Amino acid sequence: YIKDMGKLERHEQVQADIESGLVASRNLALTQRAVFLDRDGVINIDSDLVKHPDEMVLYPDATKSIQALHSAGFVVVVVTNQSVVARGLTDLKGVEAIHARMERLLAEEGAFVDQISFCPHHPDKGYPEEVPAFKIECHCRKPKPGMLLDAASRFNIDCSNSWMVGDSERDILAGQAAGCRTIRVKTGHGLKPSTVVPDAHAAGIWEATTHILAAK
């Protein structure tokens, strides 16, 4: 549980969270519920491979969605494939700078995520700009569940009581492989045909959030 309580209204919110049991429930000795969020097309507008911090533009409902999930006691983890590293379009520091901008934009409206996990790999080889060290088969690239399972281990997450929200087939497959319930949003690549069936569909991150809160 993290909260800046330097202002009176924030102090009052922390006091309310203590009295409601929210603070105690975030003790990692206790099993946690989580919402795993894909990044591009869910939290931010997918501009076809985000390569620079200036290309990080949040969806209008992203901040209030993440705030609502935290208020309900969920751990919020971003799990994102970032093959821009393997393709040589940016490097690890570049991705970290993009994430720093995302976190700053969220923080400006009072929201935060508990962890950002990203996979820099891509299995396909033969492109001129590619970085060979990252052109490998790995356990973390979705649709494999590695990023979700690693976060589950760190935060003591019960995946059977958690959700994966994504816009692509690989997001849903990763969530299912980890044992999570899944929601596919219609933003980003969410309208592309797929034979993979999620537990629910949603117009965007806010509708996905309201579905999760109603189901808990």
Language-model region placement:
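Conserved alpha/beta core of the MobA/IspD/sugar-nucleotide pyrophosphorylase nucleotidyltransferase superfamily
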Residues: 1-30
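Short, conserved phosphate/pyrophosphate- and ester-handling motifs at nucleotide-, phospho-/glycolipid
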Residues: 7, 144, 204
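Active-site neighborhood of HAD-like aspartate-dependent phosphohydrolases
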Residues: 31-77
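Metal-dependent phosphoesterase signature
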Residues: 44-59, 85-93, 108-109, 131-140
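Substrate-recognition element of Asp-dependent hydrolases with the DxDx(T/V) motif
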Residues: 62, 66-102, 111-126, 175
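Conserved Lys-Pro-Asp/Glu-containing loop-to-beta segment of HAD-superfamily phosphomonoesterases
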Residues: 131-133, 139-169
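Acidic, Mg2+-coordinating phosphoryl-transfer loop and its flanking beta/alpha structural elements
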Residues: 163-202
